[in-house]
Every structure is written in structure tokens, then in C-alpha cells.
């Protein structure tokens, strides 16, 4: 019971944070000055704004993949399609209803990669746990 309560609480907290980030009226990184990005790209050419944004979108959905895999152990495979659906809904809402945000299919791709990583983490952990038992 304690494990389920902890997972449910974690899922609720994650959902709130995800909603705040996804539905914030402006890009959440709008406070970062553009001169910072120019300096960073000049200093380390590999690190571009687009790559950082793509990586952030991956990281944003790793917890969703983990949580869905743990909450639905018998249907773990649903984690990735569910994450794709959540991401598509977020991008649609951003594109249609939030004028300060931009919808992007690349965000959906990154989010699905993140959820897949989360699912893989759980699968590897379960496999390692079974080997020890």
C-alpha cells in the first residue's frame, strides 16, 4: 500500500509540474537572455539552443515513462504510446490555445524518446532485481 501511495503522489506532483511547464503562457526559457545562448554557441559550438531544448524535452518525459511503467506493471508497453498521446495533446493545446507558445513535432519526438528511456530504466531495474532474487 505504501508503494502505491508513493507512486500515486509522485504521479500527481509530476502531472502538476508538467502542466505548469507545458501550459505556461510563454516559453519557459524566455527569461534566459539571447546573449547567453550566443555566448554558449560561440564557446561550445555543439551546444545550441535547439539541442538544449530537445534534450530538455527528453528529460521532461523520462519520469513519465518511469511512472507509467511502475503504475501499470502488467501493461508497461502502454507507457510509450500514452506518452506520445500526452505530448501530442500538449503540443496541440500550445499551438491552438496559447499564443505565446509554439507547437513542434520535434517536441513530441523528444518526449517519446524520454518516455522510452524511462520505460527502459524500469525494465532494466526489474531484470536486475530478478537476477539477484
Give a label for each model feature.
Residues 104-109, 113:
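Individual transmembrane alpha-helices with interfacial aromatic-anchor signatures
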Amino acid at each position: 500500500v505504501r508503494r502505491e501511495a508513493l507512486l500515486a503522489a509522485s504521479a500527481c506532483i509530476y502531472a502538476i509540474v508538467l502542466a505548469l511547464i507545458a501550459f505556461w503562457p510563454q516559453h519557459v526559457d524566455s527569461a534566459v537572455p539571447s546573449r547567453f545562448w550566443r555566448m554558449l554557441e560561440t564557446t561550445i559550438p555543439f551546444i545550441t539552443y535547439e539541442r538544449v531544448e530537445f534534450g530538455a524535452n527528453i528529460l521532461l518525459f523520462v519520469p513519465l515513462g518511469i511512472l507509467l511503467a511502475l503504475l501499470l506493471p502488467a501493461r508497461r508497453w502502454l507507457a510509450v504510446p500514452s506518452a506520445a498521446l500526452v505530448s501530442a495533446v500538449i503540443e496541440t493545446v500550445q499551438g491552438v490555445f496559447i499564443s505565446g507558445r509554439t507547437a513542434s513535432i520535434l517536441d513530441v519526438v523528444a518526449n517519446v524518446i524520454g518516455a522510452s528511456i524511462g520505460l527502459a530504466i524500469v525494465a532494466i531495474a526489474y531484470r536486475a532485481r530478478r537476477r539477484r532474487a
